[in-house]
A protein has these predicted regions:
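ATP/Mg2+-dependent ligation/transfer catalytic cores
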Residues: 1-135
Length: 135
């Protein structure tokens, strides 16, 4: 479900959310997180939360290391394993360059482009995930 920015602010206040995990994925599919306080939400929605991309393999070097995380409002989720008091919520993020253009290594943007390109050719995708382990 897509929430508005004001609905997310209201939800954060009503549910006693103390931290928001800004979640993204590196080029090998590993989940990465940055935590922000609720008072940083306005900045996250408008300009994004800056991070040093040179710290993530494949994301850039020191010369092009400024990237920004901008939350996708349709992905708000309260993390259930956290306490009822001082809760933590998660938002998946788009990765943007400082000029607002999408970062070419953003796996979610790459997937969306593939889906859009396929739809333009009359093809649709169905995705699923599977938990797997070996003993």
């Amino acid at each position: 479900m897509k929430y508005s920015e004001s609905e997310i602010r209201q939800y954060v206040a009503e549910e006693d959310v103390k931290f928001l995990r800004m979640t993204f994925f590196d080029l090998t599919g590993n989940q990465k997180n940055m935590s922000i306080l609720p008072d940083a939400l306005d900045r996250a929605f408008s300009a994004g939360i800056a991070f040093d991309a040179s710290a993530i393999p494949g994301f850039g070097d020191e010369l092009r290391s400024d990237l920004f995380l901008q939350p996708d409002t349709s992905t708000l989720c309260l993390l259930p394993w956290r306490p009822d008091h001082g809760r933590v919520a998660r938002l998946f993020c788009r990765i943007l360059r400082s000029d607002g253009t999408p970062f070419e290594g953003d796996s979610r943007a790459l997937l969306q482009k593939a889906v859009d390109d396929a739809a333009a050719m009359g093809v649709s995708f169905a995705f699923g995930s599977e938990m797997e382990f070996y003993l």
